[in-house]
Amino acid sequence: MDVSVIISSKDPVGQTVKRLGYSFEEIDEDVTEFSYSKGDSIVMICRHESSTRTPAFTIHHPGNPGKSAMGGKPESLAIANARLLTSIFRSMTRIDANIEKIIEATHHGPTEIPKPITFVEIGSDPEMWNNEKLVGKLVEAVLKGIERMEETDCQNTTLIYGGPHYSKLASTVAQSDCISHIISKHYISELSSNVIVQSIERNITRPRTAVLDSIPRSKRETLTSILSSNNISIELR
């Protein structure tokens, strides 16, 4: 599989990657709203922001599960490459740095790119974005994850619904399974049937299992009905 690693001229981490001498293609658009169609899959390396400014390496699939959008379209999910995300995440966990490595729930755009896209990020403040040592370690983990993708062993491709945005459950499940879209608890009450179907279909490898993380019984009916009708086994946590 031909994986295109890209950065943005509008992103500080992209500029740190550039200073380190990597020759990845550079786009001139915002990382949440751009067009790109080269390669079989895409990896965007960029900044991560959070109000807590906690140092972290993060990875996620893009998409807007709800009616509001940050780049891309509302209620629209990008195509997920679960094996690629999982291979890179496993490589990230081996980085020799005492900072958090975690899988985030699906969020932000772009959503309409015709290829699978994975976001790999470092955060959560300018000090981290400009830290050449840590950014370099992250880039090398990405390259190693891409190199090992085809040999990455996954028992299942798994969807996760519920739980927090920073999914420690996904980070645990990724030890055995490939992680597809994660729809956090913040979207469950407004989750449309269309987005549930997209979370199943917008994948290059069709998910076979779904984990429901602390979703109240009153909010499960539509979700479990659609999952069951698509022959996806359901595990309640």
Swiss-Prot record:
Keyword Metal-binding: yes
Listed transmembrane segments: none
UniProt keyword Hydrolase, yes or no: yes
UniProt keywords, alphabetically: Hydrolase, Metal-binding, Zinc
Cofactors, names only: Zn(2+)
Cofactor binding, per record: Binds 2 Zn(2+) ions per subunit.
Record InterPro entries: Deacylase_DtdA_archaea, DtdA
SUPFAM superfamilies in the record: AF0625-like
Superkingdom of this protein's organism: Archaea
Protein EC: 3.1.1.96
GO BP term, pick one: D-amino acid catabolic process
Its biological purpose: D-aminoacyl-tRNA deacylase with broad substrate specificity. By recycling D-aminoacyl-tRNA to D-amino acids and free tRNA molecules, this enzyme counteracts the toxicity associated with the formation of D-aminoacyl-tRNA entities in vivo.
Similarity annotation: Belongs to the DtdA deacylase family.
HAMAP family for the chain: Deacylase_DtdA
Subunit structure: Monomer.
Protein name: D-aminoacyl-tRNA deacylase
Upper lineage: Archaea, Thermoproteota, Thermoprotei, Sulfolobales, Sulfolobaceae
Gene: dtdA
